[in-house]
Amino acid sequence: MRIATEVFGEWADCGKDIGMEKGHALAVEDMISFAIQERANLERNFNFLDLGCGNGWVVRKLENEPLCVRSVGIDGAKQMIEKASKVDSKSEYLHENIDTYSSPEKFDLIHSMEVLYYLENPALTVKKITDLWLNQGGRLIAGCLLYTSPS
């Protein structure tokens, strides 16, 4: 079986990342809208981390939110990070393996879409995220879509 980061790197090279963005847009919009409203209700600025950021489209979306003071994306596919960095010099993009990444800072909002099932040990990684990367009172919001037919 091929490693997911290799496949997604090839997708970045051939433009398939745009299809991923479009396919996930509605679900991500719901998740992010909920989290942003929650932050607004707290009347606090927040920093944001996108795990498995792909071409950075969610990072760019959050960097334009008035309460978001910092927006960071990490992805295991080097080509995705290169693509994200080319179109966005304001945010930080890191080529990292989520399973082994050690964040030097904590975040108020951590987002992940269609990533958890690629991890070596999802439960352990989620524990690491909540214990070490998420600020007290922060929010981890993750999504996995269920497709009922191949596309």
What are the functions of these language-model segments?
Residues 49-51, 55-100:
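Class I SAM-dependent methyltransferase SAM/SAH-binding core
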Residues 45-47:
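Nucleotide donor/acceptor-binding cores
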Residues 1-41, 58-61:
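Conserved class I S-adenosyl-L-methionine
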Residues 114-115:
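Short catalytic micro-motifs in class I SAM-dependent methyltransferases
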Residues 111:
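A conserved beta-strand element that flanks and buttresses the S-adenosyl-L-methionine
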Residues 137-145:
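Conserved beta-strand signature within the Rossmann-like core of class I S-adenosyl-L-methionine
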Residues 147-151:
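Conserved small/polar residues in nucleotide/adenosyl-binding loops
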Residues 123-136:
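A short glycine-rich, Lys/Arg-flanked "PGG" loop and its adjoining helix->strand segment in the class I
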